[in-house]
Amino acid sequence: MDEERALYIVRAGEAGAIERVLRDYSDKHRATFKFESTDEDKRKKLCEGIFKVLIKDIPTTCQVSCLEVLRILSRDKKVLVPVTTKENMQILLRLAKLNELDDSLEKVSEFPVIVESLKCLCNIVFNSQMAQQLSLELNLAAKLCNLLRKCKDRKFINDIKCFDLRLLFLLSLLHTDIRSQLRYELQGLPLLTQILESAFSIKWTDEYESAIDHNGPPLSPQETDCAIEALKALFNVTVDSWKVHKESDSHQFRVMAAVLRHCLLIVGPTEDKTEELHSNAVNLLSNVPVSCLDVLICPLTHEETAQEATTLDELPSNKTAEKETVLKNNTMVYNGMNMEAIHVLLNFMEKRIDKGSSYREGLTPVLSLLTECSRAHRNIRKFLKDQVLPPLRDVTNRPEVGSTVRNKLVRLMTHVDLGVKQIAAEFLFVLCKERVDSLLKYTGYGNAAGLLAARGLLAGGRGDNWYSEDEDTDTEEYKNAKPKEELLKPMGLKPDGTITPLEEALNQYSVIEETSSDTD
């Protein structure tokens, strides 16, 4: 009945009456996402009638009411089949200012029309394959990039930016051709990175370092939403970027990684929004070539170095042990490097473990990221080793028993999801520099058996990657318990699959012990 009354008024053609009836319809159906099939034909005709009204010279408020109802109706895929035409798409492009290259977006009164038009396009493109094809034909991605450039540094039009970015994300998600166009032809990587810089109000202190105000206000809801949409669009643009072939690409990825480091060190308006922001940053960092992730850590600034020195100077000169404790407990600093971003990633990983669900979607991206960072960058690996696998003092409880990060990761090594247990084991193995004896020390043989079997390392040894050599860090507690622990070392295997006699296996293990030592 609502559709029938609205259709009658829309066909009558009086702008004031159309605005009133459509506003009533919008208020009533604002939260409607499922529609009765019996009124499907009426909704199709109402959509057609609204498009006919939109081509006329009507007041802005009437345009907004028309677009609000069209956005609601476009949630129904069946309604879109007859109304998704090139002519109708062009009407929406015109209203969204996507056809006007020289328009500078000075008329604030038009902003609600632009936003509602972009919202309609988001729904229509998402729900209609015909609209997706027309988007290619109309070169919609290029038009969206042009609109972004107009409002790149204009904070008061965040809604326009947000829905422009959302539509760009949808297009790049649905069409691989558009991803390639965005990356190369439209220079989407620097453009979207600049959008993030604007949302975060970044002030650069060096080529890849930004000033962080830890006492500053959180991001506004609008800035956070814009940043999230930009991160999602960037993920699609960079999804195939595993190798860097040109120096310019390497520089651009480092700039983006530096922006993402800044992103990890700021907060949104709520805890949930902060987690969503950081989650999308983690996903995007997974697309950055690992050689460019060195910018996640940076040397301490003069102010940070002075603060470290001041903290130590406040202690009496005879308090050497306390000074060592202060240095050790500063979890943001390692080897003269600022490790804040890595610390945030580690905390993010632990929160995802504590959730206890959706590990494959929520946990594996950050675990994979930390694994690759540790494998490629020595300072990151050594810092994470100190945080996750500190010197082993608890030798009475099983490795999977307890509430430390190590205990939680060891429990994941026997998780039912193959992908989850593989990446958890791989992370710990890399922190142990892919040395079997070190991994067994921290995880136990039973927990590590799956990874060792997959790599053919049940008899001991180490992985294929090279790591630097450092000093032995076995604690006295572990050294005292080690003779008992040796009884649990894996038996060797002969080529025919039979188990090596105990005496022979111990002799082989002794040789390994003499030629290697546990490190960092």
From Swiss-Prot:
GO terms for biological process: G protein-coupled receptor signaling pathway; regulation of G protein-coupled receptor signaling pathway; sensory perception of smell. Its main location: cytoplasm. GO terms for cellular component: cell cortex; centrosome; cytoplasm; cytosol; plasma membrane. Residues 476-488 have a biased composition (Basic and acidic residues). It holds the Pfam family Ric8. The modification Phosphoserine is found at residue 468. Residues 468-494 are annotated as: Disordered. SUPFAM superfamilies: ARM repeat. One of its GO terms (molecular function) is guanyl-nucleotide exchange factor activity. Keywords: Chaperone, Cytoplasm, Guanine-nucleotide releasing factor, Phosphoprotein. It is found in: Cytoplasm, Cell cortex. The modification Phosphothreonine is found at residue 473. Interacts with GDP-bound G alpha proteins, GNAL, GNAS and GNAQ. Does not interact with G-alpha proteins when they are in complex with subunits beta and gamma. Chaperone that specifically binds and folds nascent G(s) G-alpha proteins (GNAS and GNAL) prior to G protein heterotrimer formation, promoting their association with the plasma membrane. Also acts as a guanine nucleotide exchange factor (GEF) for G(s) proteins by stimulating exchange of bound GDP for free GTP. Acts as an important component for odorant signal transduction by mediating GNAL (G(olf)-alpha) folding, thereby promoting-dependent cAMP accumulation in olfactory sensory neurons. Belongs to the synembryn family. This is Chaperone Ric-8B. It comes from Homo sapiens (Human). The gene is RIC8B.
